[in-house]
């Protein structure tokens, strides 16, 4: 049987480009996982770039599990760059902020070197769990003059572990025998180092006189891993200091991550946020 058919389709594709080395630290190399647009006849515009930092309680990240979900976000019209940072087991905070800076600067260089369809004027930082703590701390360190990194138009935080003191009061994550916040800071316990823990928390750097990009936050009300009080506290601090922030608390939900943050309602909110900040 032979048939001729006509098929209407969008020839815009999204490709996965693995393992871009962005920095060699000597004792380790760190890489990016990139999802980018492609059209055989060429692209007519440049796309906003979302730098995504996976959560892993600041330990070694699993860089591949989220890629299918991140592809759904990419198809809304974005480049996704997933950043592998140095885990707390080999380098204590704040070296991870340096990693984010180095990753972004690497992408800027590649944009110019290879004429990539990435819009260097529309960079966003996004993180989940411990990754969102690092994303927020990166823009705060930049705003306070501690580092200088490419301009960020907005920050997207999912289930943020923004307050290390709140995190230290939660039960240990399954499979861990040592508190992740203590490993992150290189101390024996948070209880004996509360000042250090506070200084590594987002609230410690938020002031009215600094300039921050708009912040979009999500957290499940009954998150079983990272207390929702992290996001509530961060939202209140940003509001009190007159910074632009939107917070969506997902009621009656006991999820920490996964498909909930890549559902159509959440993706639509992210899409609207990015359009409003361009």
Locate the predicted segments by residue.
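Alpha/beta-hydrolase superfamily serine-hydrolase fold, recognizing
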Residues: 1-278
């Amino acid at each position: 049987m032979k048939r001729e058919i006509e098929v209407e389709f969008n020839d815009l594709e999204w490709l996965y480009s693995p393992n871009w080395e962005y920095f060699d630290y000597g004792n380790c190399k760190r890489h990016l996982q990139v999802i980018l647009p492609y059209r055989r006849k060429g692209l007519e515009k440049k796309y906003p770039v979302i730098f995504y930092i996976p959560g892993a309680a600041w330990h070694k990240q699993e860089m591949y599990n989220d890629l299918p979900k991140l592809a759904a976000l990419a198809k809304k019209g974005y480049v996704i760059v997933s950043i592998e940072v140095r885990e707390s087991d080999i380098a204590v905070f704040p070296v991870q902020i340096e990693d984010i800076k180095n990753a972004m600067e690497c992408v800027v260089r590649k944009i110019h070197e290879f004429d990539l369809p990435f819009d260097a004027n529309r960079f966003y930082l996004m993180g989940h769990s411990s990754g969102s703590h690092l994303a927020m701390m990166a823009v705060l360190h930049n705003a306070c003059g501690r580092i200088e990194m490419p301009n960020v138009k907005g920050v997207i935080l999912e289930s943020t572990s923004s307050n290390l003191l709140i995190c230290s009061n939660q039960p240990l994550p399954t499979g861990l025998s040592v508190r992740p916040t203590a490993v992150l800071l290189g101390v024996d316990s948070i209880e004996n180092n509360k000042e250090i823990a506070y200084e590594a928390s987002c609230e410690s750097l938020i002031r009215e006189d600094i300039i921050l990009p708009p912040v979009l936050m999500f957290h499940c009300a009954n998150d079983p891993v990272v207390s929702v009080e992290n996001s509530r506290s961060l939202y209140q601090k940003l509001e009190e200091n007159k910074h632009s922030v939107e917070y969506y608390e997902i009621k009656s939900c006991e999820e920490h991550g996964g498909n909930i943050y890549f559902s159509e309602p959440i993706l639509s909110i992210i899409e609207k946020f990015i359009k409003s900040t361009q």
